[in-house]
Amino acid sequence: GMVYILGDVGMRGKKEELIAFVAQLKGRKVLIKGNHDDVSDYRYQQLFHEICDYKEMHDTIGKEHYSLVLSHYPIFSWRNMGRGRILLYGHTHESEEDRFYQKCLSEMRANDCRHVYEAEELRAYNVGCMRDYMNYTPRTLEEILNSRRKV
């Protein structure tokens, strides 16, 4: 299947080690570039099915269809955010910056005087690999959505 990597694969380490590491990962890989990703090496580029800055896509869990935005960075406004489209992002780790971002989204939900978010919950998930529920392991969309329900 497809494996979506939301950036900063090459944050540390030598280029040869990075190429060897990514080459051993299973699945067809899509890299959503982060601020620490150097994709100038042709050998590295060839390891990915696609390399992009931002991706809009759909996924299905059973009979449920999900509309998604994949970005390395957390963003405050994404297409159809008030119509159920879910943002998956990384970059912020488990930082004060991420807590501030999530607080801002909560304020947007609570103070929605235009009722933009009324029909669907505004959802953005930090899927950084260092998060407890990610544990440096690829996760399915279902696992990501269920992890938030447990919190």
Positions of PLM-derived features:
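Active-site neighborhood of phospho(di)ester-bond hydrolases with catalytic His/Asp-centered motifs
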Residues: 3-8, 29-35, 70-71, 87-93, ...
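Flexible, gly/pro- and Lys/Arg-enriched active-site loops
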Residues: 52-56, 96-129
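A short, conserved beta-to-alpha structural element at the edge of catalytic cores
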Residues: 27-44, 118, 123-148
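Core catalytic region of metal-dependent phosphoesterases/phosphodiesterases
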Residues: 1-56
